[in-house]
Amino acid sequence: MAEYSYVKSTKLVLKGTKAKSKKKKSKDKKRKREEDEETQLDIVGIWWTVSNFGEISGTIAIEMDKGAYIHALDNGLFTLGAPHREVDEGPSPPEQFTAVKLSDSRIALKSGYGKYLGINSDGLVVGRSDAIGPREQWEPVFQDGKMALLASNSCFIRCNEAGDIEAKNKTAGEEEMIKIRSCAERETKKKDDIPEEDKGSVKQCEINYVKKFQSFQDHKLKISKEDSKILKKARKDGFLHETLLDRRAKLKADRYCK
């Protein structure tokens, strides 16, 4: 086992070359994976498909068929709008609603006419209420990458043969599948807590801090000539900033050093 470890740690020319190639491939795969994630996002223009309850806020649209959205009529009823054929063509103003969160699982929806969406006694979706009551509460249901919208009568919405939007089925089939699209600014990646100066190699890190704190009286960077291995150990032990400050102090390259 000891001999095997020794052989594995020995840097041969060919092995070293492969190792670098493997590292490069690993970075390329990571970059490609991130690009694929962006590509796989279901986006039409500025309208992207939400994948969880937390993403539902502000102006949204409800897509029931490819490019076809729930469309508000001026009589308080709703129908399925004409499909938008253009690749980047999002929902029109009558197809846009304001989502209001009521709890951890329920929302209210307000049309462009200023009325809240609810259901009547016949199970039809209507938008005639000025306030949010029990009938104006909706529950988005996410399962296996699909989504449906549950009304207050415990039925899922769909578009019937007459073109009306109704909620009459207790179970969700293909006809009840929807997409909620949002035009809110999407948070693509969480920002890390690492300062920009601390990123990169220890040598680059030292240069970053010298640039940040040096007084630049002679317009030249003063970088310590001491071994950078000290910095590597300091970073590992959690004393990088203190070590960098000491190195700058020796060169009097920090305007805050006495």
From Swiss-Prot:
Residues 16-35 are annotated as: Disordered. A motif (Nuclear localization signal) lies at residues 22-32. The keyword Nucleus applies. It is found in: Nucleus, Cajal body; Nucleus, Nucleolus; Cytoplasm; Cytoplasm, Myofibril, Sarcomere, Z line. One of its GO terms (cellular component) is Z disc. InterPro entries: Actin-crosslinking, FRG1. The keyword Flavoprotein does not apply. Pfam families: FRG1 (PF06229). Residues 17-32 have a biased composition (Basic residues). CDD domains: beta-trefoil_FSCN_FRG1. Keywords: Actin-binding, Cytoplasm, mRNA processing, mRNA splicing, Myogenesis, Nucleus, Ribosome biogenesis, RNA-binding, rRNA processing, Spliceosome. Homodimer and homotetramer in solution. Identified in the spliceosome C complex. Interacts (via N-terminus) with KPNA2 and NXF1/TAP. Interacts with F-actin with a stoichiometry of 2:1. Interacts with KMT5B (via C-terminus). Interacts with GARIN3, SMN1 and PABPN1. Binds to mRNA in a sequence-independent manner. May play a role in regulation of pre-mRNA splicing or in the assembly of rRNA into ribosomal subunits. May be involved in mRNA transport. May be involved in epigenetic regulation of muscle differentiation through regulation of activity of the histone-lysine N-methyltransferase KMT5B. This is Protein FRG1. It comes from Mus musculus. The gene is Frg1.
